């Protein structure tokens, strides 16, 4: 079969389902993976028949290899991976728990680095799909991280989240340089996402467009980054912040 295969590693609250749907609508075969069965059940309801799932942790080499093996058993290959790390709970520098902090960094920085390595190893083992559609330089595969706004800007009460998201962004940039010679592109989508504790007034005063990014908007950005039309894009972050990073201060 000539359809590309996309892995979605981590579903988050809504974004993972939107990403999987968007790629499926583009004709991709899909495997979604998450440690929480209820999220996988939601994904099964959201996706068309034919999507595969993997239930297990995704922060170790073994867990990642198991997810890739599930994709290979279902579809025979992988072409794109979308990684959606967990958002850590709020805490502060002066009172964070050291053990919890260390585990969070292991999940973020180490988990991101392991994901790049394990996925890249598989991409390098397989033959490329025949080129179709728009003519671009062939790509071996793509890996895209979906990060929160804490990857580029911090705020009080979000210490561990900010450190972890910044660390993943560093892994993305360093990994993109390492894998460029192999035609594997690595990028990130950074978005202001809805949060349960954030009121509408927060975004109205701080975001020129007055709202957070929608899951479908994030998914479309990921789809573009993984497409042949973006074959010259690597090591970059596409920021969906409604103009927030351009604004000095707050709106009236």
Task: Please place each PLM-identified region on the residue numbering.
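Substrate-binding pocket helix/loop in short-chain dehydrogenase/reductase
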Residues: 92-93, 97-105, 203
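Alpha-helical segment proximal to the catalytic Tyr-Lys
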Residues: 121, 177-178, 231
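Short, small/polar-rich loop/turn modules that mediate ligand/substrate recognition or access, typified
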Residues: 180, 185, 233-235
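A conserved structural motif in NAD(P)-dependent oxidoreductases
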Residues: 207-218, 229
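Short C-terminal tail/terminal secondary-structure segment
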Residues: 234-252
């Amino acid at each position: 079969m000539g359809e590309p295969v996309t892995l979605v590693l981590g579903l988050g609250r809504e974004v993972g389902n939107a990403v999987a749907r968007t790629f499926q609508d583009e004709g991709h075969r899909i495997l979604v993976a998450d440690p929480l069965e209820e999220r996988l059940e939601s994904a099964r309801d959201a996706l068309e028949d034919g999507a595969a799932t993997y239930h297990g942790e995704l922060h170790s080499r073994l867990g990642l290899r198991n997810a890739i093996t599930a994709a290979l058993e279902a579809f025979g290959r992988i072409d794109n991976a979308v990684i959606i790390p967990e958002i850590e709970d709020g805490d502060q520098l002066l009172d964070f728990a050291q053990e919890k902090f260390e585990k969070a960094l292991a999940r973020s920085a180490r988990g991101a680095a392991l994901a790049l390595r394990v996925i890249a190893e598989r991409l390098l083992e397989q033959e490329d799909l025949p080129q179709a559609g728009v003519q671009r330089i062939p790509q071996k595969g793509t890996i895209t991280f979906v990060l929160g706004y804490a990857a580029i800007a911090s705020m009080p009460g979000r210490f561990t989240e900010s450190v972890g998201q910044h660390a993943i962004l560093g892994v993305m940039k360093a990994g993109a340089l390492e894998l460029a010679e192999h035609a594997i592109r690595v990028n990130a989508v950074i978005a202001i996402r809805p949060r349960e504790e954030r009121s509408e007034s927060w975004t109205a005063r701080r975001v020129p467009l007055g709202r957070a990014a929608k899951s479908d908007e994030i998914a479309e950005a990921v789809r573009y980054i993984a497409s042949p039309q973006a074959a010259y894009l690597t090591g970059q972050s596409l920021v969906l912040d409604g103009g927030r990073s351009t604004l000095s201060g707050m709106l009236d």
